[in-house]
Amino acid sequence: MLTLPPENRWLFREPFGTVFSDFSMVLPYIEGKIFCTVGDVVTHNALSAGLIPSIGVIDGFTKRSPYLKMPEIQGHILHVTNPAGTITDELIAALRLAMDEIPCVVMVNGEEDLAVLPLTEILPDGAVILYGQPEEGLVICEVNKQLRANAKKLLTYFVSL
């Protein structure tokens, strides 16, 4: 299990990609691509737009409050435990399995926010990750060599337990 020490959490305040204020703005970027959502609101917005993420990673909360708007989930559902501020082996294994079970929702007991990092390694080049940036909007990042390098660098700030 990897744990992000509190003193390093500031590193994750900056978005990994381009921020959009409205979900409809990302539609041209995900058309015909494998895309994954991390977060309940982003996953809800995709499903409400009639789009089924290849992998949706949710925890039932947004801004630490229960999120009750989720439409009916499509595809397989995997349940994992991943405490806040961590990336567990269980989460990584579920994300890998989800790639074989598309479409799949990974339902996290704990917190899903950091799932973006392992997804950069698991997804193929050209896949797209969408996640929410509180008070800013929706972040879109395309998986490529540069994104993987950025994620790998951020992982050096974690402690292995």
From Swiss-Prot:
Enzyme Commission number(s) of this protein: 2.7.1.237
Record-linked InterPro entries: GTP-dep_dephospho-CoA_kin
Catalytic activity annotation: 3'-dephospho-CoA + GTP = GDP + CoA + H(+)
Keywords: Coenzyme A biosynthesis, GTP-binding, Kinase, Nucleotide-binding, Transferase
EC class (word): transferase
One of the protein's GO biological processes: coenzyme A biosynthetic process
Binding-site residues for GTP, renumbered to this chain: D40, V41, V42, D59, E112, E135
Gene Ontology MF, one: GTP binding
Disulfide-linked positions: none
Pathway as given in its UniProt record: Cofactor biosynthesis; coenzyme A biosynthesis
Coiled-coil stretches noted in the UniProt entry, renumbered to this chain: none
Role played: Catalyzes the GTP-dependent phosphorylation of the 3'-hydroxyl group of dephosphocoenzyme A to form coenzyme A (CoA).
UniProt record similarity statement: Belongs to the GTP-dependent DPCK family.
Protein name per its UniProtKB record: GTP-dependent dephospho-CoA kinase
Organism whose genome encodes this protein: Methanocorpusculum labreanum (strain ATCC 43576 / DSM 4855 / Z)
